[in-house]
Amino acid sequence: MQYKTKAKKSLGQNFLQDENIIRKIVQLANIKKHDIVVEIGPGLGALTRYLLSSSNNVSVVEFDASVIDTLIANCQKYGTPHIYNQDFLKFDISSLENSSNQKIKLIGNLPYNISSPILFKVIKDSDKIVDAHFMLQKEVVERIVSLPNSKSYGRLSVILQYHFDCSMILKIPPEVFYPQPKVDSAILRLKPKNSKELLKNYNFFEEIVKQSFAQRRKTLHNNLKSILKERKIDPSTLPVDTNLRAENLSVGDFVSLANFLS
């Protein structure tokens, strides 16, 4: 592996360089030869090499043009990925679907500074993917997989758990990266749910979740006061107890609340 390129702090770059960890990630992602794989932010190709050995159809989406020559050089012995030098947030995943409409496996060591926007884009594309395996800051993964009645349970937990089965499958220490980040990392697995509770208005559901967690220490009654007043709704008629805080509600509770208020 060549490490000639200097990591750019502005892009949140930390290059993975531990071969054992890389092999473990690919193993956990269960990638087969026929899979269509898209790697987000391949950097210098440490993970890409193993993806090329596992699948016949690997695409990479890399925003930083300065790493692409090194990426190609590092992958030379393993194959050639389809390279898209662009921002993943503007990338059209459906352009990769083949004639049989085969769904895509997403994987990547996500830049920590834009991990949330990427996750929300993946939500929009959830009908096009088989699963996703992302390396993220461990604290973020813990928030995503948190259950109700915990301090780390929040907006991200509710929104992602509505769409996916979410699990933390591997913890990763800082020393396997170059340069070393100041935080621990973890692998998040997202698997789209086969069936979801029906929502009357998804955008309104997102808004209700956002408002409910706006001030964590306040009750639902206080956080949703303006919405209830606007709709002239008596809090006692709601399907949830508004004396509770948002962190006490399950994903299903938020669905019921949003549908009632829609």
Curated annotation (Swiss-Prot):
Molecular functions per Gene Ontology: 16S rRNA (adenine(1518)-N(6)/adenine(1519)-N(6))-dimethyltransferase activity; RNA binding
Catalytic activity: adenosine(1518)/adenosine(1519) in 16S rRNA + 4 S-adenosyl-L-methionine = N(6)-dimethyladenosine(1518)/N(6)-dimethyladenosine(1519) in 16S rRNA + 4 S-adenosyl-L-homocysteine + 4 H(+)
Top EC class for this record: transferase
Keywords, comma-separated and alphabetical: Cytoplasm, Methyltransferase, RNA-binding, rRNA processing, S-adenosyl-L-methionine, Transferase
Enzyme Commission number(s): 2.1.1.182
Compartments where found: Cytoplasm
GO cellular component terms, semicolon-separated: cytosol
Alphabetical list of SUPFAM superfamilies matching this protein: S-adenosyl-L-methionine-dependent methyltransferases (SSF53335)
Residues at which S-adenosyl-L-methionine binds: 14, 16, 41, 62, 87, 109
Function: Specifically dimethylates two adjacent adenosines (A1518 and A1519) in the loop of a conserved hairpin near the 3'-end of 16S rRNA in the 30S particle. May play a critical role in biogenesis of 30S subunits.
Family: Belongs to the class I-like SAM-binding methyltransferase superfamily. rRNA adenine N(6)-methyltransferase family. RsmA subfamily.
Name the UniProt record assigns to this protein: Ribosomal RNA small subunit methyltransferase A
Species of provenance: Francisella tularensis subsp. holarctica (strain LVS)
